């Protein structure tokens, strides 16, 4: 049996309470769902597959399970069959027949899905240090200060580029004000295509571990960075999300959150997940749109260090390009003027 020994009794209890059996007919570990002390299995009971999630960490999964259950009840996530906070185990329906998700369809389906998600009753909040979305960088205090200092000390980026990253972070954090009206139920892990499954009819959001009440633009920007490749794409994407053409303020806030996300994934993958491996900056970075296309289709997986470094670099290069555009300065101006009157 592949279940960790310390979790076997809890899994047996889960199967018994949910299905009236003490063992699954089949069980197979899912590699791309297993990470960060979480193990995910496809289990078959009486001919029907389900997803068994076993959390090996010690933190309380109440927020995770609460958000996942709310999304499932709304038809945005697979049906939840069982959760146990103390045992840190969940069983949900297994999304069968997932197929490649064409970008053209995603431009319409994903923002509609996010609009439905954000229409749900408010999700629980989460302590700032447990925020694993890009809005972590918009916080203030010793945790973010320590991370920025660590990034500077590790010197993964060339010195002048590290100064640029810190300056752009400070600029964005000073302008992008938190607003109560912009907080909404959020998935917070949509930079990965594996968390948006398309079965040919419906789109399902899976892996709710990072979910909480967050800035609505965080999910919107993270997903867009994979699938929006032109101004025309952006018009479609934002139009579907807002239900009409976005105004200048909405476009500005969206664009700035995209830049926050670029900084976040630069830091996460070049600095925190590179394993200390030296980066050869003489080698050109991959093309951003090509990399994201291959990432979206599953051709690229962020499992090995070289892929993680390449991912961080394409985000960094895209940020450097975007901050030189007139739109960046205009977006800063629009949000700065609005922020004067709307801060918490």
Where are these regions (language model features)?
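Short, solvent-exposed loop/turn elements at beta->coil junctions and helix N-caps
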Residues: 27-32, 253-254
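Short glycine- and hydrophobic/aromatic-rich loop-to-beta-strand nucleating segment
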Residues: 88-92, 190, 227
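Active-site activation/catalytic loop segments of kinase-like enzymes and analogous catalytic loops
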Residues: 217-249, 259-278, 291-303, 307, ...
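Active-site acidic catalytic loop and adjacent metal/ATP-binding pocket
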Residues: 31-47, 51-52, 170-220, 232
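A general structural signal marking secondary-structure boundaries and capping sites
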Residues: 19, 75, 114-125, 176, ...
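ATP-binding pocket architecture of kinase catalytic cores
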Residues: 30-147, 152-163, 178-180
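An alpha-helical support segment within catalytic cores of ATP-dependent transferases
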Residues: 4-24, 122-188, 199, 235, ...
